[in-house]
Amino acid sequence: MTEQRPLTIALVAGETSGDILGAGLIRALKERVPNARFVGVAGPRMQAEGCEAWYEMEELAVMGIVEVLGRLRRLLHIRADLTKRFGELKPDVFVGIDAPDFNITLEGNLKKQGIKTIHYVSPSVWAWRQKRVFKIGRATDLVLAFLPFEKAFYDKYNVPCRFIGHTMADAMPLDPDKNGARDVLGIPHDAHCLALLPGSRGAEVEMLSADFLKTAQLLRQTYPDLEIVVPLVNAKRREQFERIKAEVAPDLAVHLLDGMGREAMVASDAALLASGTAALECMLAKCPMVVGYRMKPFTFWLAKRLVKTEYVSLPNLLAGRELVKELLQEECEPQKLAAALLPLLANGKTSHAMHDTFRELHQQIRCNADEQAAQAVLELAQ
């Protein structure tokens, strides 16, 4: 940034979640530096905020080993071209948003050319493949972390990291409108309601749906009028779930929802869900939950040896204890899942204590992440 040249920020986002983060960051930066220039790899939201797209985000948004191998030559070409063009542009800061397999190498290339680099959204190095932290430390000037335990991990290895809070915590109210969500879904205010969230990936829906449905059948024995809502991320997952339900629980009445996962969580007294971001969202929705997860035996055997954390769900990692019941692999079976959910549906002391802790954790990570990220970029640009 000079008198002749405005603040110039280069960014690369590789998927929709990164596009959302990038758009929020650009918006916050423009409020402070209205004439700033933004260039790089951007999706529609970042472009709407004024980012000049040298490549469309979809070019990087490939999933799975086969798809990546099929596009590898193109991906390597894009990274080499960005290394060259950013090197010539000399932006004040480069921000790689998530997409670590693509961005961390690019960050390292740019740092060698004297360009300041930020990696926005920490990979799960604290959980597995921890030695990646050394590569990240060499490639970046700063990591922006959503969660406090991530910063503690980087501090241990002397890698500069800033905890900025979580954008999802900023977006969700501390006190959700449960009755409002029930009105949207057509659930009576006085009904007991359970949300089933068997995951967003095909393999998760295949492995978990039958046990989740059998669990709901058991719970109906105690709560005959139990309302069951099942949000599914897209038509493919809905079709998959309907096929499994027809085989396992054809007579079980449920509300199938297209998307609307957040509304389902807010409306429900309890949720049974796969681990992942959904558990964090459920915590922020203040919905008591049980995490059930199952994978293929060899994958689980491998995961047990690679994963270095005591818990798998983000609420437990944030709390530093088993706040939420985790039933994994052989433990993920209907009798045990139902037994863990019953006290939550009763809306007693267990639920209220969990709700209070969820609210405390929400406050801890509600830090206006867009503003915090913008401040970090400007400080590094000076």
Swiss-Prot record:
A Pfam family hit: LpxB
Top-level taxon of origin: Bacteria
Pathway: Glycolipid biosynthesis; lipid IV(A) biosynthesis; lipid IV(A) from (3R)-3-hydroxytetradecanoyl-[acyl-carrier-protein] and UDP-N-acetyl-alpha-D-glucosamine: step 5/6
Gene Ontology biological process terms in this record: lipid A biosynthetic process
Keywords: Glycosyltransferase, Lipid A biosynthesis, Lipid biosynthesis, Lipid metabolism, Transferase
Catalysed transformations (reactions): 2-N,3-O-bis[(3R)-3-hydroxytetradecanoyl]-alpha-D-glucosaminyl 1-phosphate + UDP-2-N,3-O-bis[(3R)-3-hydroxytetradecanoyl]-alpha-D-glucosamine = lipid A disaccharide (E. coli) + UDP + H(+); a lipid X + a UDP-2-N,3-O-bis[(3R)-3-hydroxyacyl]-alpha-D-glucosamine = a lipid A disaccharide + UDP + H(+)
Gene Ontology terms: cellular component: membrane
The EC number(s) this enzyme carries: 2.4.1.182
Molecular function as annotated in GO: lipid-A-disaccharide synthase activity; phospholipid binding
InterPro entries: Glyco_trans_19 (IPR003835)
Annotated PANTHER family: LIPID-A-DISACCHARIDE SYNTHASE (PTHR30372), LIPID-A-DISACCHARIDE SYNTHASE, MITOCHONDRIAL-RELATED (PTHR30372:SF4)
Family in the record: Belongs to the LpxB family.
NCBIfam families, per database record: lpxB (TIGR00215)
Role played: Condensation of UDP-2,3-diacylglucosamine and 2,3-diacylglucosamine-1-phosphate to form lipid A disaccharide, a precursor of lipid A, a phosphorylated glycolipid that anchors the lipopolysaccharide to the outer membrane of the cell.
HAMAP family given in the database record: LpxB
Annotated protein name in UniProt: Lipid-A-disaccharide synthase
Species this protein is from: Escherichia coli O7:K1 (strain IAI39 / ExPEC)
